[in-house]
Every structure is written in structure tokens, then in C-alpha cells.
Amino acid sequence: MSKNNYYPYPPTLGKVFLFKRGPEIVSMESSETIQPADKLESILNSTSTITAELLFNTFDIPGISSKTDKLKLLFQKAFEQGINPNIQDSSGNTLLLYACQSSLVEVVQFLLKKGANPNISNNSDNTPLSKIISNRFIDKTEIYIAKLLLQNGALTELKDFVGFTPIQSATQYGHTEIVKSLIQNGADINVIASIETNSYYSGKSLVESVPSNKPELKALLTLTKACKDNNFSIVDNTITAKDIVEFIDWQLSITPENSRFFDKHLSELDNLKNFLETKELVSNETIQKINEHITSYSTTEISSPDVTPSFINEAEHQEYNLAGETDKSAPETA
């Protein structure tokens, strides 16, 4: 979606826009129009003060995806001049949200390193993560960006404007790879859609919200819940041996580097191993592989990836009222 869809009118000379620095709203006089791509170099070489509006306008420059190095230099220059990396436009959108929306991976990484907060919601209660998830079709780049956000402190339980958490939305859209990342980062899989959402999903669990053309996602969520609760009575004959093998492959790919709650993961994996030992669903070799995985990490000191505490603390007290695989198949309503 173009940034201009968020402004009450396109950026033109002399218009006044509201921007937000943290809790403070400041009025900024517009003096720049959208710059063509070949002017980005001249902006960098200019001695003029960089305004917040100019930064937001850069996302509309044609071919900007091929000029991310210069864009990062521009942002760096702006930050050195005192612009807050978490500045918001009149709709509450941040630079990070636009970078995510434009699939500019290097810019997303740069902004996160500069202190961009992935948990700031815009006026529609959308964060960068929820904006990505709400796309009906997502590609590998968007999946990667979602993982980056989670690795850099994006919270798993912030609700969007409808009232859904990220894992609820990802499940409803059938975004299996993002669901996996959310689970690895501690997302609540027992969440029930509130009746207040007044939607098709009202009162439904995650498993009940899975699109009918995503049986593998339904199997993944069922097996995840069985492992967490150590209750495998919910594993019925709709879950195939192939589903179980794929689930095991995913579980074995989880490490302390890509999971915030690896100690819990090992416990759940042990539950799975004990269950499989009583069934003839997989080979003894596979069970042995699970056991070796558990043993190898049980004998070493585990340190979870760092999550910036300020993001979590800020999100809990936030009052912004102005605040992988390519997944190309559209979900069907069950």
C-alpha cells in the first residue's frame, strides 16, 4: 500500500503535517515534494536540515529498493541531526513500518539496529508485524522480515485493530512459516478469538481458525498443543505420518538461537519422544535422533537470544492514540 494512502492529502508544498516523537506531537511545515531517484545523491550532499517528511517521502521514490545503501546513509544523517528513529507521521506510521511494507530488508535491519521499536502501533492499531501478517499473500522476503521483527523484540500478544493477536491472524491467513516463528517466540496457542471481534472467527480456537486448504497447519498446531500439554489424545487419524515427520523436522531445527523459550521446547520435545515410543508412527532411527537432540542441549548451558527490554516495557505502557517457504496459496474459509 502506498504511503499516500495514509496521508489526508499527497505531500505538496506548504501543507502542514503532524508528526510524533514518542508521546509528543510536533507540527512540521512541509517544504519538500517527492524526490526522483537521481536526486537522492544530491539530498545526501546537501547541507540543508533533513525533515521528517522528507524521510517518509523517500519510500515513494521510484526504484528505491535498488538504492537502500543511500537510503540508509540518509537516515543516518537525519538521526545525527536529531530526528528520532521512532518518529511517526499523521497516521501513526513509523519509518520501520514503511520499510517493512516496502520489503526493504537492509533498511529494516538498519532501523532496528538504530533503535526502531517494532511494537509501536499506528492509528489503526497495526504494528509492522501485524501489517505483514495481514497480507493475504506473502513471500520469502516478508517471512524473513517477520522473523527479524520477532528476533528484535516484536511482542507476540499485541492485538490488531480487529482484536486478533499475530498468531491468530497468521493462522487465519494460513501463513504457516510465520506461525512457526511465533510459536518459537512464545506466542500463546490457546488463545480464543473474542466474541467482540464480531467476525467469522469469534469464539474459535487456533485449530478451528485454520483455512480448509491448510491441513498441514492444522496438524502442526494440534501436535504443538499436544506436546505443550503432554496430551496426545487430541492426535487423531486426520494427522498423517507425513505430518508427524514434518513436525519433527521443524522441532529439530529449533535451537537456542531461534527460540526464546528453548528450555520449554526441550521439555515438549521429550513429551513427543515418549509418545512416539509407544506408537509405530516413525522409525526407531527418528526417535533416536530426537533423543540425541535433547541430550546434546541438556548437557550444555543454554542462553536464549537477547530481547531489548525497553521494547517490552514501552509496549506495556504504550498510549499511542494518535496514537521459510514462499506461501502463495490463498486460504479458503472453512
UniProtKB/Swiss-Prot annotation:
ANK repeats: 80-90, 91-120, 124-161, 162-191
Gene3D superfamilies given in the database record: Ankyrin repeat-containing domain (1.25.40.20)
GO cellular component: cytoplasm
Recorded superkingdom: Bacteria
Family matches, as PROSITE patterns: ANK_REP_REGION, ANK_REPEAT
Matching InterPro entries: Ankyrin_rpt, Ankyrin_rpt-contain_sf
Any Pfam family hit: Ank
Protein keywords: ANK repeat, Repeat
PANTHER family xrefs: ANKYRIN REPEAT AND PROTEIN KINASE DOMAIN-CONTAINING PROTEIN, ANKYRIN REPEAT-CONTAINING PROTEIN-RELATED
Name of this chain's protein: Putative ankyrin repeat protein RBE_0347
UniProt lineage: Bacteria, Pseudomonadati, Pseudomonadota, Alphaproteobacteria, Rickettsiales
